[in-house]
């Protein structure tokens, strides 16, 4: 499995800012989108290009363009929506597929409640968006959905990932690539990442208590 912890200074600076528990909803949301853009930049670095000739200002010129890649971006509800605008700013022609899975707080297992995938997935690469890769259960369930629908290549983009979640996904889907701003220390007994970011969904949407 390809696992990329993006060490670019801008990425590390921004994820550091997001760890501040006193950060406003506005700032947290903006940083999530900015990191979505930066991480998507890394995740798409291996897209193939092809030469294309067009009329330049001084005559015909040959340039490079993406070689027919079709991409669907897959935000996992609801927190993944907080990274979507940033990714689409980089890949505006991408189709958006949406998956909803909610973690059972007792079993820590994902419970699906929504699935709306774009058509012709067998022709597309999929970029899954979720701020947190914790136990890996939600990601595994999402990958299962995408593979059943025929997605040809799948990558996951996360703000923070836990080693336990990475290993769980690796055991089931070793062909999937993971891109993250940080691999944190561990999960606690509730399945939350430490030191983590807190509840990313609540922080993005301003629904946290207090």
Curated annotation (Swiss-Prot):
Reaction equations catalysed: UMP + diphosphate = 5-phospho-alpha-D-ribose 1-diphosphate + uracil
Record's function text: Catalyzes the conversion of uracil and 5-phospho-alpha-D-ribose 1-diphosphate (PRPP) to UMP and diphosphate.
Binding site for uracil: 193, 198-200
Pfam families: UPRTase
Homology family: Belongs to the UPRTase family.
The protein's name: Uracil phosphoribosyltransferase
Entry note: cofactor: Binds 1 Mg(2+) ion per subunit. The magnesium is bound as Mg-PRPP.
The keyword Calcium is annotated on this UniProt entry: no
InterPro entries named among the record's database cross-references: PRibTrfase_dom, PRTase-like, Upp_B, UPRTase/APRTase, Ura_phspho_trans
Biological-process GO terms, alphabetical: UMP salvage; uracil salvage
Activity control note: Allosterically activated by GTP.
Enzyme Commission number, as recorded: 2.4.2.9
GO molecular function: GTP binding; magnesium ion binding; uracil phosphoribosyltransferase activity
Metabolic or biological pathway: Pyrimidine metabolism; UMP biosynthesis via salvage pathway; UMP from uracil: step 1/1
Keyword Protein transport: no
Catalytic EC class: transferase
CDD domains: PRTases_typeI
Binding site for 5-phospho-alpha-D-ribose 1-diphosphate: 78, 103, 130-138, 199
Keywords: Allosteric enzyme, Glycosyltransferase, GTP-binding, Magnesium, Nucleotide-binding, Transferase
Cofactor: Mg(2+)
Species assigned in the record: Stenotrophomonas maltophilia (strain R551-3)
